[in-house]
């Protein structure tokens, strides 16, 4: 499975089916259309987006879809199959790329898009709103220490009041046919889809999947069997559904000891508020019939930060992806490496930093500069993995890494793939990412290729709203896990705490500033006439050959480690 990064978190059965829900929106006047997809999986990868586009363009060119107007998102369940990224790091616990899983996902998403386009009909869109009462046990901030560092937080919030460090609002797009019959809805609320823990072996759509089922079943009882309900993610980076410390498991859980019951409990709360948002939407005016979209590809290895977002750092920029010890240590709801090993890793990381900085002092400028830049850009992070430069603990000689194979099966897999040459010299995680904005009436959907924290999401919303507000955008909705996955996006202040989220904010302490800089640039282009816009696609993500992938593929039909489906 994908999400927890644990080698033992493998599939042995199926608890719920997994769905991709697609919504095609078309403006008859301009002829423009956009498709929004929400899939029950951990996150969209570049490989999945490319696979979907390749099939749509080859098999269904008449539908008029291109990468600019196809908006792929995921609801982030950690209990769905993994192995569908072409980048090495995200497949290490699988272990490897799994062609069958990749193909099933691509086929399912394409089928959903084609069905949605085939069944489209004249209708309207309304906005519904609701919120979670403070006593509803639905979401909690798992990184209060980092959250409280933000200047937006005027009074520090105590750990036991972490429910207050959450955006408790839900916003919905409600789709209605011309005859008044409901067609479907998409709502946004940020909370991790992690009620089901890393000791699970059954495929499940988790809390948001149950919420979607409850709303669809409710609509079916009202005579609307084709109603589709997507529970999409907002800024969920630091938000968990778990708050009770499980003494047996040594991590936090939801309402009940049975994780599936906790997921249903949380899903029911989300469903109840979604039902309120549905009722609210029915009372609202239709939004304007207008469609627009924009897409940019950005190489995040060297983004110069707009001074507006640089926090007085005149040299603020990003660098190649680095993962910190804090990332590998995990969270309250999903622990990572053993604390003793984490302490050792921290000591090694700091020792390597000292040695490299000493080397820089004695080296020529062309050798010293990359070293000095790395540690300045990454700030307080204790660097364990340099995914952008293909290093672990400062070395590219992965197969001879000092960490023994028995210490971590994922490390064993890394060594194996390095030895057979399948990792090559290409980055282990995406360095070039797609940024997407879709405008639907007076709403802007911002597709973020990663996990953005609560306050970081608010800042990004404001950045886009400041540009697109004057052209009629009243709402900016952050949609996480879109089109690709780069890890986390914390604020500059949160990053300094180096909690899990900061350790997984890979492009350095100014990562959010880089996203604000580039989304602002994309939004500015979208204020121009459609045909006068600059194409922001010179940078493209890394491509991998079939030969490279075959050397690190895990084929579920041929490998000795068989996946047994028991029902």
PLM region spans:
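Non-catalytic substrate/cofactor recognition surfaces at enzyme active-site rims
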Residues: 1-567
